[in-house]
Each structure stands twice: as structure tokens, then as C-alpha cells.
């Protein structure tokens, strides 16, 4: 019987799953789209049962129906999800409200300032290696405590999306150590433990789950979960992690200097480093197993920019938009765009940032507008890479993955703007592929995540074209200057992202 492993990833706009054998061959795969809700500007949520758990059940049934061997051959399960998210549950394990999503949700700006004023920015950074931002969970937890007292009164545990799925599968409350970086100021980065000394007015420590490494077995599949999923009872379930970490693993990040660049609805990148490197503009973290470290960051919008444009000006397919962009040229007809349509994460850490189209004229075309957004993504990636290099963290090899990476036009523009070669893996499943490998590591079929090269092969290399370098260098300077010149005009009005 060919031993195999199930990996499943819950993303911002879709969920994907695959069953992979011990040699890294994909036996079957499936995906399902879903939406997120935006009840108010700056608020982003998903229903934990309908989307997170519902997608898991749907995809399990689909995979098991397609699997051409006994389901008993599945020797491990791992999940990854968007994150860090905030989901309060009651004593019965029932969600009390929709899950609050990661850095694109900016409702807790007042709470960020409140925590910083009470504890001090430098105290928080010294203990956790993080600056508080819209990516941080604790300000959102405090927001719930202040604004939804009826929810807070019933809250027994606070989970992230992956933790909720692991709970549904095993009955155990867990959080992986990589994802715990999102819980500043109550997570001690170096000790890898919860730290009650800075929790104070935020929450009681017993509301937090148990901390485990991502490939550690959290428990076995319960009989109830087996009946619901169709999986055999007793299958080991590992702790899992955030989607970007599994995406990095699934693209072949194994050595220090390897960097995963994920292009999805948003962007996230992970650079493997030889040690912890806390930097104010980014997020330093332990990685998926003891002795592994990363520096991470990401842009708030990438694929969502092009989705917005297509929905706002309907009637053209993605291919038609890209063909129009081909009729434009480097420099996008003089249009410079700022891609901050949902604020910006790294390196700006500015949730109040706004999108901008600058330099338009009656001669501007739809292709110029589309290309200006493509170039804006490239400029944003370049900004991040430059700031990481200033901090002493350099990428020796970049692996590109995610739905937006399927656009060779976009990938070439980003490569030309940054001057960095990008590699595309042969297997493009991404996070769920990394999840399957995590499940295999948890089952002791591999000794370490560093053996991922036994599964992953790189297929294509995209190298920079020098012909447009001068144009893009000038465009990049204009891009940087445009943000600095307009940021004071674009501050969010009072009350837009939260309750006063």
C-alpha cells in the first residue's frame, strides 16, 4: 500500500487540498472558492464553520472520492490557513463570532496605540521582536473585549484558523510556534513561551492555546471527526501553521538565504535566516522546527488589485486586461500607482495608506492603468527587498508561488524592477503541498523539513531584462516620493476603521 499524506490549506479567496505519496507525487487534488465579508471599511472576516470547517469537509470528501487506493493509506494530516486570525470560542468549542482576519483587517488601530502607551513600544519590541501592527492579534483581542462584551464574557479560548481546524479534528487546543509571532506582546520570541508579564489588561493567559512546533503531532483524528470527514479514525494530525509558512516549505525553502515570494490576493514572503533577526519594519520568527529562523513580511494587496479593477470596470477577462497592458510600455504611460488599497503591511506598517493613480491624462489607456498596478507591485516588492538588505538579510534564491505568479507578464515586470531572478517550482500546489510534507515529518517519515528537496523541483527561471532598468529606477524613485508626499493627505478619517 502506497503511504500518503493529506495537506489542506485555507486561503483568503479559496481552499486547496491534496493527497501526496511518500515520493512527493500528487495522487489527487481539489480546490473550492470562498469569500470574505467586509462588514465595515477596514474590517475583514470569515465564518469559521461555514468556510474554514465547511471547506475542510467538502475537500476531504472530494479527495477521498478521487483517491485510487484505500483511505487507510493516509498516514497523516496537516492544515495551514490564513493568519494570524482571531477566533473566540466558548467552552463547548463553538465560535462566538466570525474570525477576524490577518493584517488586512485594521479595526484595532486605537487598541494598538493603547497597548503601546501602556507598555511602551521599545519594551514590546525588546520582549517580542515585533512592533504592533494590523497583523497583531492582541490589539484585536482587546478590541473584542472592549466592543463586544457579550462575546468576551463567553470566550473560553482564542484560536487562529489552523488551531480551530486542529481542534475540530483532535479536540486539542493548539497554536504553532511560528504563528505565535502574531501574538505580541504576550509571546516571548526567544523563549518560545507565553509571557504573562505583558498580558495585563489584554486577556487572561488561560484563554491562549498550547504552543507546539508545526510538525508536532497535536493528536489523532477523533471518531466524530472521522465520521464527518470520511478519513480513518486515529490518523495523526500535526499542529500545522499559517499558509505562508507551508507555502515556503512547499516551494523548497530549506537553506539559509532561500526566500519564498507568495503572490496571492495579498503578498507574503519568508526569508530563511541563520538566527533570529528582529527588525522594526519586518517580523522575525522561529520557523517550523527547533533551530530554524525566518524574517517575514508582505504587501496587503497584489492579486486583489487586479480583481478590483476587473470588477470595477467589468467586461474584460484577465487575459484581455493583460493584452491591453502589453500595448502599454515600461513606465505605464507616465502613470505611477500606489497599491495600498487595503493599507500596507511591510515595510511601511501603515494601515492608513491609500491607493493612488498619479499622472493620468486624456491620453492614458486602460492598458496603462493595468500596467501601472503591475509595476506598483514590483516597486513594493523592491522596497521590501531593499529594506531587508539594509537589515543584513539577503536573499540568495527566490522561489515564486501563488495564483498571481501564473502571470508571466507580472513576474517579468517584478523581476525587471527588482533585478532579482525568480524561480518557479514545478509543483505549483503551494501550501497544501507543504502541509502534506509537514504531515510526513510529523509521522517520522522524514527527519526534518530540510529534506523538502526530496519532493520539490524548480521548473523555470525568470531573469531580469536590463533594457528597462533606467525607466524602472526612475519610476521607483517616483513611487517612493509619491507616498511620502501624499501620506498626510490620505490619513484615514476618525472612526473609519473601528468604533470610537
Regions found by a protein language model. Name each.
Residues 1-98, 126, 154, 226-227, ...:
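N-terminal glycine/serine-rich phosphate-binding loop of ATP-dependent small-molecule kinases
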Residues 6-7, 116-128, 133, 142-174, ...:
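Active-site core segments that coordinate phosphate-bearing ligands/cofactors
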Residues 65-103, 131-135, 166-187, 210-213:
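Short beta-strand-loop/turn "lid" adjacent to the catalytic site in phosphate-handling enzymes
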Residues 74, 206-208, 395:
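Core-facing hydrophobic residues within beta-strands of well-ordered domains
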Residues 87, 110-114, 247-249:
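Pocket-flanking alpha-helical
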Residues 24, 47, 77, 105, ...:
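Residue-level signal for inorganic ion chemistry
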Residues 101-118, 436-437:
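Short alpha-helix plus adjacent loop in nuclease-associated cores
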Amino acid at each position: 500500500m502506497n503511504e500518503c499524506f493529506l495537506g489542506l490549506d485555507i486561503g483568503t479567496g479559496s481552499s486547496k487540498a491534496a493527497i501526496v505519496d511518500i515520493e512527493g507525487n500528487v495522487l489527487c487534488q481539489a480546490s473550492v472558492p470562498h469569500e470574505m465579508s467586509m462588514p465595515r471599511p477596514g474590517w475583514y472576516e470569515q465564518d469559521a464553520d461555514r468556510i474554514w470547517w465547511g471547506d475542510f469537509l467538502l475537500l476531504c470528501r472530494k479527495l477521498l472520492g478521487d483517491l485510487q487506493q484505500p483511505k487507510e493509506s493516509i498516514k497523516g494530516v496537516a492544515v495551514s490557513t490564513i493568519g494570524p486570525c482571531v477566533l473566540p470560542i466558548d467552552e463547548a468549542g463553538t465560535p462566538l463570532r466570525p474570525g477576524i482576519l490577518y493584517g488586512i483587517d485594521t479595526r484595532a488601530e486605537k487598541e494598538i496605540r493603547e497597548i503601546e502607551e501602556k507598555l511602551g513600544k521599545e519594551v514590546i519590541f525588546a520582549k517580542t521582536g515585533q512592533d504592533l501592527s494590523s497583523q497583531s492579534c492582541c490589539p484585536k483581542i482587546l478590541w473584542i473585549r472592549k466592543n463586544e462584551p457579550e462575546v468576551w464574557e463567553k470566550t473560553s479560548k482564542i484560536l487562529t484558523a489552523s488551531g480551530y481546524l486542529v481542534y475540530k479534528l483532535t479536540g486539542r487546543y493548539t497554536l504553532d510556534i511560528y504563528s505565535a509571532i502574531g501574538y505580541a506582546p504576550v509571546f516571548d520570541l526567544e523563549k518560545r513561551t507565553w509571557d504573562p508579564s505583558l498580558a495585563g489588561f489584554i486577556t487572561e493567559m488561560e484563554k491562549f492555546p498550547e504552543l507546539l512546533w508545526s510538525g508536532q503531532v497535536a493528536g489523532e483524528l477523533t471518531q466524530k471527526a472521522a465520521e464527518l470527514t470520511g478519513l480513518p479514525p486515529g490518523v495523526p494530525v500535526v499542529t500545522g501553521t499559517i499558509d505562508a509558512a507551508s507555502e515556503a516549505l512547499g516551494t523548497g525553502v530549506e537553506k539559509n538565504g532561500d526566500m519564498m515570494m507568495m503572490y496571492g490576493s495579498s503578498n507574503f514572503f519568508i526569508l530563511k535566516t541563520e538566527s533570529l533577526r528582529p527588525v522594526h519594519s519586518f517580523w522575525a520568527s522561529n520557523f517550523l522546527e527547533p533551530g530554524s529562523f525566518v524574517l517575514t513580511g508582505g504587501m496587503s494587496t497584489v492579486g486583489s488589485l487586479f480583481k478590483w479593477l476587473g470588477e470595477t470596470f467589468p467586461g474584460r477577462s484577465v487575459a484581455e486586461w493583460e493584452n491591453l497592458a502589453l500595448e502599454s510600455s515600461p513606465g505605464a504611460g507616465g502613470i505611477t500607482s500606489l497599491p495600498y488599497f487595503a493599507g500596507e503591511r511591510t515595510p511601511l506598517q501603515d494601515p492608513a495608506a491609500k491607493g493612488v493613480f498619479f499622472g493620468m491624462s486624456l491620453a492614458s489607456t486602460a492598458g496603462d492603468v493595468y500596467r501601472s498596478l503591475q509595476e506598483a507591485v514590483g516597486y513594493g516588492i523592491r522596497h521590501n527587498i531593499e529594506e531587508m538588505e539594509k537589515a543584513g538579510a539577503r536573499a540568495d534564491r527566490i522561489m515564486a508561488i501563488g495564483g498571481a505568479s501564473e502571470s508571466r507578464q507580472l513576474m517579468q515586470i517584478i523581476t525587471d524592477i527588482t533585478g532579482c531572478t525568480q524561480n518557479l517550482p514545478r509543483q505549483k500546489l503551494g501550501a497544501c503541498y507543504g502541509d502534506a510534507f509537514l504531515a510526513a515529518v510529523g509521522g517520522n517519515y522524514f527527519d526534518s523539513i530540510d529534506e523538502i528537496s526530496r519532493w520539490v523541483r524548480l521548473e523555470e527561471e525568470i531573469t531580469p531584462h536590463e533594457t528597462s532598468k533606467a525607466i524602472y529606477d526612475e519610476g521607483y524613485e517616483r513611487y517612493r516620493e509619491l507616498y511620502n508626499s501624499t501620506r498626510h493627505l490620505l490619513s484615514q478619517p476618525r472612526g473609519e476603521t473601528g468604533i470610537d
